[in-house]
Amino acid sequence: MSEEIITPVYCTGVSAQVQKQRARELGLGRHENAIKYLGQDYEQLRVRCLQSGTLFRDEAFPPVPQSLGYKDLGPNSSKTYGIKWKRPTELLSNPQFIVDGATRTDICQGALGDCWLLAAIASLTLNDTLLHRVVPHGQSFQNGYAGIFHFQLWQFGEWVDVVVDDLLPIKDGKLVFVHSAEGNEFWSALLEKAYAKVNGSYEALSGGSTSEGFEDFTGGVTEWYELRKAPSDLYQIILKALERGSLLGCSIDISSVLDMEAITFKKLVKGHAYSVTGAKQVNYRGQVVSLIRMRNPWGEVEWTGAWSDSSSEWNNVDPYERDQLRVKMEDGEFWMSFRDFMREFTRLEICNLTPDALKSRTIRKWNTTLYEGTWRRGSTAGGCRNYPATFWVNPQFKIRLDETDDPDDYGDRESGCSFVLALMQKHRRRERRFGRDMETIGFAVYEVPPELVGQPAVHLKRDFFLANASRARSEQFINLREVSTRFRLPPGEYVVVPSTFEPNKEGDFVLRFFSEKSAGTVELDDQIQANLPDEQVLSEEEIDENFKALFRQLAGEDMEISVKELRTILNRIISKHKDLRTKGFSLESCRSMVNLMDRDGNGKLGLVEFNILWNRIRNYLSIFRKFDLDKSGSMSAYEMRMAIESAGFKLNKKLYELIITRYSEPDLAVDFDNFVCCLVRLETMFRFFKTLDTDLDGVVTFDLFKWLQLTMFA
């Protein structure tokens, strides 16, 4: 019996991106078809463990010090001394995954500063549909137990299914991090572990905003309200948000490090994340009072002011209504008046849910669009409007607003189209251990002028932004994972430009667009095309005699110029141009030139071929000097983009990223020889494609031999 030959498949960075895009178009990454995180298949792993009679141990997030953290919880930290990893079955005789359903009291904070995450989990328990999108049914420490559990998390536009083992950090016989009040329930501790896994460690979860957890559990988009500047109808906004299943969180800002986790006179914790779990208006002494219900993940520290559990205000409320609203003492949940809420708290976060999270609800839903993008040094990281020379190279997205809001939505206000823009930077929490923190990000919105409305999706250039002011922008540039702002603008076309504050700050991002009415969106990018010069048909008689004499002197006895001879000639000439910064032409770049011009295929250049190349290089030199704006002898990566267009090539942003990576120096400068090599390579590839595209449909098909032939000698 012959064995099947195994053929390895290797994906380069570019091909991997293409493969990922194709998979997404087929539905991979939606909640119903979540990506298996790190390739781990929960069912396969569980069955394998059951068949072998072993308990699962996750080597992708092993029970070792590095999984706890890298600094404060690092391997040599005193805070991690004595921590062991144990399974719930080693701690209790009858551990449970969930007892009587998941409730807000299942989440009690441990030694980790992730109250923001726990507040989000607490809000999640209010909605069974949302909860079980994150915590799949059918998991247990009894039936089919194999020491393996899984959870589904939203990560930057994709749902991922995350597998964990049930080895949890233990100290002095107790869970170190999140735990339930019951003591024998472990779903919240295991969910925290899954979240730590996707972020690299438990320590990576320290510090954050509730909105981050909201979004990673729902795929929704979050709005922020500074309560000192809140709209007059905020209570109605909260009521409507709770009715729509939105998740809400709030906090009290700190004025110094000493304030962190400080407890106020009325038992509110500063710098601490609370979840908003309800809102209700009650009749109190003949007046309607607006109340709001809060939850503190710590559990035991509660508000002691008006409308707290033991306050006298409840004695003047109808007994039936009072019994419906009052909660148990010391569970971390409490009521307070909306007036006190506005006075005591600093900010409110509301996570609006995507339509797929609200399938069973007969309510109005957002229209949503998501784009992924990158900022790359020298090509697409142009910085904010403060840097006009480079701002235009940032990614651009066009929005077309057609329908205004329903009249009921804006009352007497001027009509317009409401939408939320949210810009999120990717993977920054996971990269903390490498010293990389959040970049300062934001975005600007520009109205498309009438003469450009309806035009193809062409990337807007520098002159447009120099001549036009922004129509709207994010409230601020800030170093948070996400910046979001609600807008209401008249119908029309607009261009959104997301950016870092400073140029050349690299990162990946997700831009999301939530609109109340249907709207059109498209990423602006130039269409790939080349205005190539006609291939010259010259005879030797048409060439200048002086050039012929020069050629005879350079070519030698065979009257042809080889690759090595071409390098010697070009480097001798370029060395005389003292204004050019160059290391000289390499053999590889000269070989590319010969391949482009060699018509008879002998690997050398004859008189006519060398004449055409010579004129081409003179033209390239003219373009190079034109776009070397500071006369430094080299071009910046951004100047090169304009120079390439001047040479007749229109490329999209992904190709510019590749070109800058390949042809620029570490300081993002492009010298003359690299510029020439780039243009020669571009022309060669365009001409190859044009030759093969016989039916002019922009698509060519070839076998492996032809592919290798083209790529080896281009």
UniProtKB/Swiss-Prot annotation:
Undergoes calcium-induced successive autoproteolytic cleavages that generate a membrane-bound 78 kDa active form and an intracellular 75 kDa active form. Calpastatin reduces with high efficiency the transition from 78 kDa to 75 kDa calpain forms. Ca(2+) 1 binds at residues 109, 114. Residues 55-354 form the Calpain catalytic domain. Binds 4 Ca(2+) ions. Residues 355-526 are annotated as: Domain III. Gene3D superfamilies: 2.60.120.380, Cysteine proteinases (3.90.70.10), EF-hand (1.10.238.10). Ca(2+) 3 binds at residues 598, 600, 602, 604, 609. Residues 527-542 are annotated as: Linker. It is found in: Cytoplasm; Cell membrane. Residues 541-576, 585-618, 615-650, 680-714 form the EF-hand domain. Its cofactor is Ca(2+). Ca(2+) 4 binds at residues 628, 630, 632, 634, 639. Its EC number is 3.4.22.52. The modification Phosphothreonine is found at residue 354. Residues 543-713 are annotated as: Domain IV. It is an enzyme of class 3 (hydrolase). The record marks 15-16, 27-28 as: Cleavage. Ca(2+) 2 binds at residues 316, 318, 323. Belongs to the peptidase C2 family. Forms a heterodimer with a small (regulatory) subunit CAPNS1. Calcium-regulated non-lysosomal thiol-protease which catalyzes limited proteolysis of substrates involved in cytoskeletal remodeling and signal transduction. Proteolytically cleaves CTBP1 at 'Asn-375', 'Gly-387' and 'His-409'. Cleaves and activates caspase-7 (CASP7). It is linked to Spastic paraplegia 76, autosomal recessive: A form of spastic paraplegia, a neurodegenerative disorder characterized by a slow, gradual, progressive weakness and spasticity of the lower limbs. Rate of progression and the severity of symptoms are quite variable. Initial symptoms may include difficulty with balance, weakness and stiffness in the legs, muscle spasms, and dragging the toes when walking. In some forms of the disorder, bladder symptoms (such as incontinence) may appear, or the weakness and stiffness may spread to other parts of the body. This is Calpain-1 catalytic subunit. It comes from Homo sapiens (Human). The gene is CAPN1.
